[in-house]
Design a protein with these regions (language model features):
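Short alpha-helix capping/helix-loop boundary micro-motifs
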Residues: 1-5
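His/acidic/aromatic-lined binding-pocket segments of jelly-roll/cupin-type domains
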Residues: 6-7, 118
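A short beta-sheet element
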Residues: 7, 14-65, 69, 77-87
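Conserved aromatic/hydrophobic "specificity hotspots" at molecular recognition or selectivity sites
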Residues: 10-11, 142
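Amphipathic alpha-helical coiled-coil/heptad-repeat segments
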Residues: 54-55, 63, 68-80, 90-164
Length: 164
């Protein structure tokens, strides 16, 4: 949904890059970082794909990452060679067999834990990057010794294990 100069999205939506070279490079993201019913606003250079019924976030994400689907998107792009875009109406024209509800339920049951794990690993990577960014200047300046930093890293990793 366009809002002013941007697009509106919420948790569970999949953001699909519409502009070259981002689409060709596979830029796709699951929105899972907003608080409660918070709504995010962003660039018009991605298309928002929202789950409906048993068509879950993980099913949409898997489709959006599937090479044949991405190739169909790439072929449907228009515009000058350096700034090609995929029109949002591509999705109303693209046909795909809808899986049976039983299969969708089984797929969702198998993939939702993986999506949760992806989010946890992303959060862990961010925390570790912050720790690195805080420790590196201290180590390089000599204000902190390696063994002191090692203790801080061990404590942080112990907290990570407790959180997962």
């Amino acid at each position: 949904m366009p809002v002013g100069a941007g697009s509106r999205f919420s948790n569970g939506d999949v953001l699909f890059a519409r502009i070259s070279p981002c689409l060709e490079n596979g830029k796709t993201a699951v929105v899972d970082f907003l608080s409660g019913s918070e709504v995010g606003f962003g660039s018009t250079e991605f298309i928002i794909l929202s789950p409906r019924g048993e068509i879950s976030t993980t099913w949409i994400y898997a489709l959006a990452r599937e090479p044949n689907f991405r190739e169909a998107c790439r072929q449907a792009m228009s515009g000058s060679s350096g700034r090609q875009r995929l029109s949002a109406d591509f999705f109303s024209r693209y046909t795909i067999a809808t899986p049976k509800e039983f299969d969708l339920v089984a797929f969702n049951k198998a993939t939702m834990p993986l999506l949760t794990l992806m989010g946890a690993r992303r959060d862990e990577n961010q925390r570790l990057a912050q720790l690195r960014d805080a420790l590196l200047p201290e180590l390089m300046s000599g204000r902190m010794r390696v063994d002191e930093a090692g203790c801080l890293v061990s404590e942080a990793l112990d907290e990570e294990v407790a959180d997962v």
